[in-house]
Amino acid sequence: MGNKKTLEGKVAIVTGGASGIGETAARVFANLGARAVVIADIQSELGREVAESIGAKRCSYVQCDIGDEEQVKSMVEWTATTYGALDVMFCNAGIMSKAESAQTVLELDMSKFDEVMRVNTRGTSACVKQAARKMVELGTKGGAIVCTSSPLASRGGYIDTDYVMSKHAVMGLVRSASMQLGAHGIRVNSVSPMAVLTPLTRRMGLATPADVENAFGRFTSLKGVALTAEHVAEAAAFLASDEAAFITGHDLMVDGGLLCLPFFAPTS
């Protein structure tokens, strides 16, 4: 994104900021001039390490399970009290099912379904709600909320029904919140990345960038470019910045043209 400080002076929260896309976003936000970045995550050791590497004056870690709204409320309140502002909320934390099955409709493990919904749907909703309430209370000018969604929110899936459903719910939240919060000058958007190497994809057995490319590259029309966490973080930073001042209710696809291609059935 170059050296332009598009987030100069802003106070931002990044949920799931201890690893993966969230960690990269925390670093990108800081590099783009954010006055403070708060990492909210359940991974305390990793969260503290990331915050320390960015710098104590620029970044803090707060332990927060976003599925617990009281923890989200406390984290948002701590941020506003500590830094005197809240300009950006990047609702990035999310999980995939840990079920032994593929979570097809016929095999749906409802206890694992509930775990996914607790984080991806309830947790994201709590983050949007509490951030928006604080922005309204503070009279934040140009407040921005960005959620991590998925290209699957525009399609169905052969597996991982609970994850697909959760991302459809996130898109409903983004569209509704953008309509309701526009009167307060708060923009709400989402970023939908194709699969990228993160701890989440490693748990799927994809341990290297080459593994991810081999698994998903055939589904993109854009060739010769491998998606990185930096690409996703920079897309989120754009939506969070004043350069996107008239953009709200939008889902920014970072999918290499996935949705431009005909639909492919699985080969096995």
Curated annotation (Swiss-Prot):
Record's protein name: (+)-cis,trans-nepetalactol synthase NEPS2
The molecular function terms of the Gene Ontology recorded here are:
isomerase activity; oxidoreductase activity
**Does the record carry Isomerase as a key word?**
yes
Q: So what does this thing catalyse? A: (S)-8-oxocitronellyl enol = cis-trans-nepetalactol
UniProt keywords (A-Z) are: Isomerase, NAD
Family the entry assigns: Belongs to the short-chain dehydrogenases/reductases (SDR) family.
Q: What does the record give as EC number?
A: 5.5.1.34
User: Superkingdom of this entry's organism?
Assistant: Eukaryota
Position of the signal peptide: none
Q: What is the lineage of its organism?
A: Eukaryota, Viridiplantae, Streptophyta, Embryophyta, Tracheophyta
Q: What does the UniProt record say this protein does?
A: Functions as a non-oxidoreductive cyclase to promote the formation of cis-trans-nepetalactol. Cis-trans-nepetalactol is then oxidized by NEPS1 into cis-trans-nepetalactone, which belongs to a family of metabolites that are both insect-repellent and have euphoric effect in cats. Binds NAD(+) as classical short-chain dehydrogenase/reductase (SDR), but does not utilize it for its redox-neutral cyclase activity.
Q: Where does NAD(+) bind?
A: 16-22, 41-43, 65-66, 92, 163-167, 196-200
